Amino acid sequence: MIKIKDVEKSYQSAHVFKRRRTPIVKGVSFECPIGATIAIIGESGSGKSTLSRMILGIEKPDKGCVTLNDQPMHKKKVRRHQIGAVFQDYTSSLHPFQTVREILFEVMCQCDGQPKEVMEVQAITLLEEVGLSKAYMDKYPNMLSGGEAQRVAIARAICINPKYILFDEAISSLDMSIQTQILDLLIHLRETRQLSYIFITHDIQAATYLCDQLIIFKNGKIEEQIPTSALHKSDNAYTRELIEKQLSF
């Protein structure tokens, strides 16, 4: 289980004469058990990407803790093989001068160190699992469409056989039709691989399509946590505002 408990994070102002710290994440707590699919929904600047970096162990919280099976997430040995990530900008995870084969091999070597012949078969199988043929093995990221690149990023994330995958605005730059295809792929992978998701987004519609629990995030705090099935019954003013902006029931 991933636990986020009383997490706080602030950054020092870059202003020369005002060296005070600005709080970005403020006392956030929630849990993501095995089998859960949780969306963190917030507008731009709400602090959700800072929260995602702490969940991934890339940054340590100033206060509170993020743990995986009661072990601190910022320790590589704790999160290794346990959590994958897919970001909005695929260049964050796909090296521009590596082929798809090399991108997947690099992760496989870190995990298992299998012979190349074995990794070749595994890589082709991974691509097929995300809806790409083996013809993509020799392509570079700049030869891929946005949807194809995200499929490769997803293949890279599942390559380590994780229990969890965190998605940080992973589909927001894609066309609507491609977004739906990727969401359907994520639903399929969740079922076939028994994956748990933390899905960080500004898009309520995508969140409700994929996730069974919603966390509404505002100004670095949890405004509301609610089952997807109960969203239309929410009486929280900010949640209603987001719904009215994006959805019509």
Swiss-Prot record:
Protein location: Cell membrane
Gene disruption: observed consequences = Deletion of the cntABCDF genes decreases nickel and cobalt intracellular levels and decreases virulence. Insertion mutant shows attenuated growth in several infection models.
Q: Which InterPro entries match?
A: AAA+_ATPase (IPR003593), ABC_transp_ATP-bind (IPR050319), ABC_transporter-like_ATP-bd (IPR003439), ABC_transporter-like_CS (IPR017871), P-loop_NTPase (IPR027417)
Q: Which domain of life does this protein belong to?
A: Bacteria
A GO cellular component term found in this entry reads:
plasma membrane
| SMART domains assigned | AAA
Q: Which CDD domains match?
A: ABC_NikE_OppD_transporters
Q: Does the keyword Manganese apply?
A: no
Domain ABC transporter as annotated: residue spans:
2-244
| Record comment: activity regulation | Nickel/cobalt import is reduced in the presence of zinc.
So where does ATP get bound? G42, E43, S44, G45, S46, G47, K48, S49
* EC nos: 7.2.2.-
User: What is an example of a GO molecular function annotated in this UniProt entry?
Assistant: ATP hydrolysis activity
BP terms from Gene Ontology: cobalt ion transport; nickel cation transport; zinc ion transport
Going by the UniProt record, its keywords in alphabetical order are: ATP-binding, Cell membrane, Cobalt, Cobalt transport, Ion transport, Membrane, Nickel, Nickel transport, Nucleotide-binding, Translocase, Transport, Zinc, Zinc transport
What drives induction of this protein's expression?
Repressed by zinc.
The main enzyme category here is translocase
The similarity annotation says: Belongs to the ABC transporter superfamily.
How does the annotation summarize its subunit structure?
Answer: The complex is composed of two ATP-binding proteins (CntD and CntF), two transmembrane proteins (CntB and CntC) and a solute-binding protein (CntA).
What the protein does comes down to: Part of the ABC transporter complex CntABCDF (Opp1) involved in the uptake of metal in complex with the metallophore staphylopine (StP). Involved in the import of divalent metals ions such as nickel, cobalt and zinc. Probably responsible for energy coupling to the transport system. Plays a major role in nickel/cobalt import in zinc-depleted conditions. Contributes to virulence. Required for full urease activity in vitro.
Question: What name is this protein filed under?
Answer: Metal-staphylopine import system ATP-binding protein CntF
What organism is recorded for this protein? Staphylococcus aureus (strain NCTC 8325 / PS 47)
